[in-house]
């Protein structure tokens, strides 16, 4: 997985910290939305935790790529995501999240925000909201 970390540093020069974690919400939601290629969050005040987002009115997307044991294939899938301007992390289906920031505070804020949003959306599914 080192290749995925170094790829982010190459493709996002402003990134000085890359975080990668695995949680129940990340795993389940990435599997649930893998076919859509992303999860979209709209209307959450917490969206403002992401650099450049000033309002809850917009949509924040969290891309999802298919998992592969072939790191070259996985890196190619991830590289295609970086054509997008505004995104702060991505999910590998059935695996976990990668997120980044200019420093640990920013990277951790992005990670914590995504984790909350994923848990909120997972709860909405279970409550059929």
State what each model feature region is.
Residues 1-129:
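Glycine-rich flexible loops
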